[in-house]
Amino acid sequence: MSDLRITLDPDFIAQTKKEVTPHWGELGWVTYKRTYARWLDDKNRSENWDETVKRVIEGNINLDPRLKNNPSKKTIHELTAEAKQLFRLVYGLAATPSGRNLWISGTDYQKRNGDSLNNCWFISIRPQKYGNSHIVPAYLTQDQVAPSMPFSFLFDQLMKGGGVGFSVVDENINQIPKLDQKVDLTIVIDKQSKSYDASLKLGATDLDEWKKTNQEKEDYIYYKLPDTREGWVLANARLIDMHFNSTNPENKKKLVLDISDIRPYGAKIHGFGGTASGPMPLIEMLFDINQILNERAGQKLTAVDATDICNLIGKTVVAGNVRRSAELALGSSNNQDFITMKQDKKKLYHHRWASNNSVAINSEFDNYQPIADSILHNGEPGVVNLELSRNYGRIKDGYQAGIDGEVEGTNPCGEISLANGEPCNLFEVFPFIAQKQGWDLKEAFKLAARYTKRVTFSPYDWEVSRKIINKNRRIGVSMSGIQDWILSTFGHRVVTGFKTATDSETGKEIKDPVYDPEIIKTVDGLYQAVVDADKDYSQELNCNTSIKHTTVKPSGTVAKLAGVSEGMHFHYSGYLIQRIRFQETDPLLPALKDCGYRTEPDIYTPHTICVEFPIKAANADSDNFASAGTVSIAEQFATQAFLQTYWSDNAVSCTITFQNDESDQIAPLLHQYRYAIKSTSLLPYYGGSLKQAPKEPISKEKYEKADNHITGNVEIVFEQTNEDQKGLELVDQSDCDNGACPIK
């Protein structure tokens, strides 16, 4: 029997559209239309919101493994009812799956690529076996350990649109053997290739010229790259592995890579979307990586070398147009070369921008001042406490030795602690909106837990991932718009004050936060609802319960859809101008102008138009409202600790902002919360002083004046013109303050 497929009835969708109004933020519909609405060739337009939600929910509900094995009528009925509930929840924007799911779920690409629904991944940079994976170099057996494997994993996941955290701590880097030899790399290309001239300028060699003097020789390895993602990965793997005797069985020192078949710049990429970069970025990457490896011949790679290789891979992937490479490098806290590697401005601008860098610590670590000094200068490194992640769920639940003992790092935004090869798996509920729309919050979080659980049954491409996902079934149910919800529901922020206390280990005076007990009780109840939902569904599916369940994701672009505060973060300002950049040919622009939005040419990027959106935060007029520009660094630390203690058993993504006069508090606060925060990062608060800044705080009066100029609904005006175009995106989006997340 073929798999049964659940679909949502058009009559149900039509009725829901009458009953439920999506909670679009001021930027919501425009952001959706240019980020997550897929092009429909048969209708010559991009999706509408109900079509996107239908695709996403159907793509998810049909992952339930029971549908593959003659499901009962009861199961079909229950899953159909659940799909309807999910549709209502997401259509109303009371909750959303991750941006990755909004873009990919329910597509043919999802069916072809088992990894496609997971936003981000983690891999340890040490020799590993490829195993029974979709990519295995022909010169290796599946069980052969190879230095190239983690780099191949990273390259593959980045090209599939995922972000990757990677670990270059001493314990991993020390496992890489010394490089045995240099490799003479030649990249050849046929004259018939449209990329011929551009490739020669970057150091490639004419194929016919090379054949004249080399074809009869036998001292080289030749590999012709197919025009596939896997071909790029395998070329890089061969280059890396040839430097090591254990993975160079022919013991040859010359590598010839033929790029003639790679599609040219501008050609369409089927599947994920976008247009091709041509082979030029790959040529640069391969030569750059080979230079790093050759310079280490006879020695061992350093953490900086490995990070450089990963950054060069990330830089190459960025050139693929629709993708934005997201990396987090995790190094040892005593490695000063790693901590200071971005101070080399030449290499920073060339490729080291491609990762956010953090250091791995434990709770005994106390040398925070050098970290604080570095943060003050360039906003890095972030801090990841692996000891807490391995031995704690929620801090409230106490020490549980090895409860997550295989954790080695995090995803790029730091909200999910991950084992080697493991992905994050995210869904977020906006309690502020869910309550307004009449949802029982526990029911909303239950639906979120079941959605993420189904994602773990995807047919994953890499053996290392399949094994750890099958074991851990990790999910990440997030709440977002937290500041809006707490202030609207409880009338004040979660931190009601501070009391003087003494650090039991150092004897120093500290200020302990005081939390509202009603908020503690509410959040704890929602956590239990997620755990109970996972337990019940795991029994239905006969699989392991999830090792961890909850998180707080940064929620940049997705929060814009619903118009709520991002994750746990405070609004940037009570009132602000948010500037969004559009390609100058975007047919949305006339609709925006007709509705009264201010537009002007972008001063930084040619052929780009900057549009100003006046934004008012929820509760902006409340006496208890605080923004990122007014809330203290101490309250932000305390708020993150609250969520780690009572809500998140994974971690909490937070970029704490600080004013110049608060910089001396960074090291003491990192030390104070060493037993309560699993990962964090900090950035100075800039306040939008740049011309055409993405966010510019403004007064209430200026907001009201700008808002009064807006006279129409962009969605309605745009649909009346019916002039949509394929392949348009917003220019230079950022999904969170530190730019760590892929947008979709």
UniProtKB/Swiss-Prot annotation:
Entry keyword set:
Allosteric enzyme, Cobalamin, Cobalt, Disulfide bond, DNA replication, Oxidoreductase, Redox-active center
Spell out the residue ranges making up region: Adenosylcobalamin-binding-1.
Answer: 570-631
* Swiss-Prot/TrEMBL cofactor(s): adenosylcob(III)alamin
So what does this thing catalyse?
A: a 2'-deoxyribonucleoside 5'-triphosphate + [thioredoxin]-disulfide + H2O = a ribonucleoside 5'-triphosphate + [thioredoxin]-dithiol
Q: Give an example GO molecular function.
A: ribonucleoside-triphosphate reductase (thioredoxin) activity
Disulfide topology? 120-424
SUPFAM superfamilies, per the entry: PFL-like glycyl radical enzymes (SSF51998)
How the protein is activated or inhibited is described as: Allosterically regulated by ATP and dNTP.
Instruction: List, alphabetically, the Gene3D superfamilies matched.
Output: 3.20.70.20, b-12 dependent (class ii) ribonucleotide reductase, Chain A, Domain 2, b-12 dependent (class ii) ribonucleotide reductase, chain A, domain 3
Spans annotated as Adenosylcobalamin-binding-2: 690-729
Keyword tRNA processing appears in the UniProt entry: no
Q: Per the record, which residues fall in region Effector region-2?
A: 169-318
A Gene Ontology biological process annotation? DNA replication
Protein EC: 1.17.4.2
Region: Effector region-1, residue numbers: 148-159
Give the domain of life. Answer: Bacteria
Active-site residue numbers: 413, 415
State the similarity comment.
Belongs to the class II ribonucleoside-triphosphate reductase family.
Quaternary structure note: Monomer.
What name appears for this protein in its UniProt entry? Adenosylcobalamin-dependent ribonucleoside-triphosphate reductase
Give the species. Lactobacillus gasseri (strain ATCC 33323 / DSM 20243 / BCRC 14619 / CIP 102991 / JCM 1131 / KCTC 3163 / NCIMB 11718 / NCTC 13722 / AM63)
Q: Gene behind this chain?
A: rtpR
